[in-house]
């Protein structure tokens, strides 16, 4: 498998005011969604076999960086990323914390104008240059 490792990247951006437990929940949901909707090109080898013959499920072949920004900056990022059609954007609205079933979430989101949605996180995948232009000045999550 030959490819350019730095050609594309994945950047998760979390609201800087999240507690660690909520941040982990947000990133978990975002990562599952990203994996489900990304093209097959995002994945490296399906299986990695160790020296003992044990198979390990493969992971993304591109860098996955986790950052944080103020909630207002996160909102602008989501809006800006939506303008770049070549990017895959997955967002996590605050309503996901107060709803259970997917149908409940759909009902709650349908009641809110985009201008009033508060995002707790987002993941962007695509061309490294474009993703870096949008997220390059953000603080790494530590």
Q: What are these regions, as identified by a protein language model?
A:
Residues 1-142:
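Positively charged, small/polar-rich N-terminal and surface patches that mediate targeting and assembly
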């Amino acid at each position: 498998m030959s490819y350019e490792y730095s050609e594309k990247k994945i950047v998760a951006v979390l609201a800087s005011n999240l507690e660690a437990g909520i941040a982990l929940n947000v990133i978990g949901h975002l990562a599952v969604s990203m994996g489900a909707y990304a093209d097959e090109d995002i994945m490296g080898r399906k299986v990695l076999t160790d020296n003992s013959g044990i198979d390990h499920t493969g992971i993304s072949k591109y860098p996955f960086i986790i950052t944080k920004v103020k909630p207002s900056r996160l909102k602008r990022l989501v809006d800006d990323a939506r303008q770049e059609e070549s990017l895959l954007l997955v967002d996590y609205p605050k309503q996901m914390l107060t709803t259970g079933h997917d149908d409940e979430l759909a009902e709650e989101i349908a009641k809110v104008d985009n201008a009033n949605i508060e995002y707790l996180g987002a993941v962007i995948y695509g061309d490294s240059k474009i993703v870096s232009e949008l997220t390059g000045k953000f603080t790494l999550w530590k």
